[in-house]
């Protein structure tokens, strides 16, 4: 699903304003220093934590109330690199790589949103953070929603960016939308791994707008998914969508903010459903 930097900047600016108002088996990941840290202008560190039977990589900086940033597909934590220095002026910012993606370790299973929300929750506890704000884009929005469902006492609020929620709103329409064909494709057993392997940059470029993402950006994201185990992990997230549908049934009282394009009917209907089913939720719409 396409995402535009200016769109994200504007939405996170809205999020900051809203937050201010409220305030007033696995294998070990490859250890590396991410050169992308240099783009953040200092004050950020890259680290990892053993949580929920896996190892999560994250980038942290700033001080103040905590904002957890959860990326979508086909990105990793770097998706938020432009806004992280801005948020760090007022918040503790933690951008995490989802289980099996980028610098995080892959596992045999556990890729449903509820379990990955537990990953994030244990990371929050590991970092001794309290009452966090969660921002999730795309599949990260599904994790953020599950986090709010499971841990209302830990989350002050959740913001979902262009995130359809399995089982909520017009999910059947989302799955049958030809412009979102990759959902069904990536749920297919085994075949996507064989077709995408070695062609990661070509495949990911399809989802990343050429006016926004340079070839260098695409190459970076391709590296985050290039290892066979990381590609498989990304696909397993999609294969876990049926489990997410079963989880996303009950009404919750945790405030949730949804943001999406006026052009994207499925997202608009999803957010309308969220407004009805989640007490305290609100929806922001951007002008295209």
Regions found by a protein language model. Give the residues of each.
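A short, Lys/Arg-enriched amphipathic alpha-helix followed by its capping loop at the start of a domain
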Residues: 82-91, 126
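Bacterial N-terminal signal peptides that target proteins for export
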Residues: 2-12
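Bacterial N-terminal signal peptides
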Residues: 10-21
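Flexible "cap/lid" subdomain of the alpha/beta-hydrolase fold that forms the substrate-access gate
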Residues: 28-48, 53-56, 61-66, 94, ...
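Structural cue for short, hydrophobic secondary-structure segments
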Residues: 69-72, 95
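Serine-hydrolase catalytic-loop signature spanning alpha/beta hydrolases and amidase-signature enzymes
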Residues: 74-82, 93
């Amino acid at each position: 699903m396409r995402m535009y930097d200016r769109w994200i900047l504007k939405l996170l600016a809205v999020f900051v304003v809203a937050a201010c108002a409220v305030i007033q088996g696995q294998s070990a990941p490859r250890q590396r220093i991410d050169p992308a840290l240099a783009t953040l202008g200092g004050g950020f560190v890259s680290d990892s934590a053993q949580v929920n039977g896996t190892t999560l990589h994250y980038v942290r900086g700033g001080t103040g109330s905590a904002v957890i940033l959860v990326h979508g597909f086909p990105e990793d934590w770097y998706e938020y690199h432009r806004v992280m220095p801005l948020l760090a002026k007022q918040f503790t910012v933690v951008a995490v790589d989802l289980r099996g993606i980028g610098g995080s370790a892959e596992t045999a299973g556990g890729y449903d949103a509820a379990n990955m929300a537990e990953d994030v929750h244990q990371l929050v506890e590991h970092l001794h953070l309290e009452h966090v704000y969660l921002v999730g884009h795309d599949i990260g929005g599904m994790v953020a929603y599950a986090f709010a469902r499971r841990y209302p006492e830990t989350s002050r609020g959740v913001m979902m960016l262009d995130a359809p929620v399995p089982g909520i709103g017009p999910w059947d329409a989302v799955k049958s939308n030809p412009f979102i064909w990759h959902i069904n494709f990536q749920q297919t057993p085994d075949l996507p791994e064989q077709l995408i392997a070695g062609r990661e940059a070509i495949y990911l470029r399809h989802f990343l707008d050429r006016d926004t993402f340079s070839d260098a950006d695409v190459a970076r994201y391709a590296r985050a998914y290039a290892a066979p185990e990381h590609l498989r992990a990304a696909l397993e997230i999609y294969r876990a969508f049926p489990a997410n549908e079963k989880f996303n049934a009950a009404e919750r009282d945790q405030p949730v903010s949804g943001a999406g394009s006026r052009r994207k009917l499925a997202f608009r209907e999803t957010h309308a459903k969220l407004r009805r089913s989640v007490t305290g939720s609100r929806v922001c719409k951007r002008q295209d």
